[in-house]
């Protein structure tokens, strides 16, 4: 706890006041103070930066660097790794880009890859990146969008726009980003619905029901349209438009984005139930007719849709309330719960996809924290802070970051899970940024006022007696910023 001296901008006599003056007029001031003084946030941030500094693979259970994971901790990696190492990671995915523009799911040291296993991944090799072997999980449609989003984060945080002109195998990064998005329009776009497609999975998951492993499209695949893939595309287009040097790209993709947003609302949003439908099936459903899939509420896809600007504030509030209700019904710990209700036993041939197992109802901070991002960005600060806290507490309890959790809070999957570390850091930073800027004024603007209290003082300094009617505006002080006391 910090103990900072009182600072006054105008000399004058005053009595001790409470830390925020009349906090009853603005409850958000209490939330602001709690965020700024929360030691758990600082602890988790330090832990997250430490584990990301130890590598770029997804976690200790994975040998690969996955693009959908790296997309969620690249900003933390930029804090703790040399710039060249971050660039090389991004570049590696472009080295393995297919002729049609597709992006691989992940890559690993070629010496550790079993290239000849007929039951394993179908590896892709690159003459310009021979030290690695890459592969693509074909049931999911978020690799291209994840890479575009990751490059966007790198450029925005580093301000290194010149990176977009880096040439990889004869094409610039900017050109390759455009081709990655175009691949989705050429190979995954369904003209009837005006949306992109993929295999049947559980929300944002990458396991299809029709195979014991379930990571590759085959003759048994049931093709679908879902909210997660399409919301990720809307986000990626927004990102690409913002940083593209060639303005023709912006004009081209803006019209595509508008059509996608219209068609998402038209075909995937159930206005009566106030939720996204799980799937639009293009060649039948893999699930029995006795199972009403439309009762399933997808938490992760809904969170990404919020980030993509697809829901109104009223709909966001309803979605958050629905998630909290689902958490209670599932006896889970956080809104990282992937869905409720789950798919019944036997719905997936992969034995790990039992009810409340893995992506079928597991509790994933990796997506729950993205809902925190969306709440914060849309002004639901109190809700975001309260719903983030159990995620932070769980990390401390387990002394580390984990891939997912059972409803009872048991850690499962990969340990040292960098995706969880990354999304929590962004959630923390988003709330801190709000708190630091909420009603903040410059020292110049505050001239003529006085500072009575600094955040971080002991309670004895914060709970004085008596009333004081100041002649000038009164401010609170915290780490170089001033805030009106009432």
What are the language-model segments listed below?
Residues 8-18:
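Bacterial N-terminal signal peptides
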Residues 1-8:
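Bacterial N-terminal signal peptides that target proteins for export
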Residues 25-48, 65-66, 103-106, 189-198, ...:
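Catalytic cores of carbohydrate-active enzymes
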Residues 76, 85-89, 105-106, 462-469:
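Short, solvent-exposed loop/turn and secondary-structure capping segments
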Residues 441-486:
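Cell-envelope and extracellular/periplasmic
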Residues 20-63, 161-185, 244-245, 251-252, ...:
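Acidic/polar, glycine-enriched structural segments that form the non-catalytic walls/loops
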Residues 69-100, 301-313, 369-391:
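Alpha-helical support elements that line or immediately flank enzyme active sites
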Residues 54-62, 70, 111, 115-146, ...:
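The feature captures the catalytic groove of carbohydrate-active enzymes
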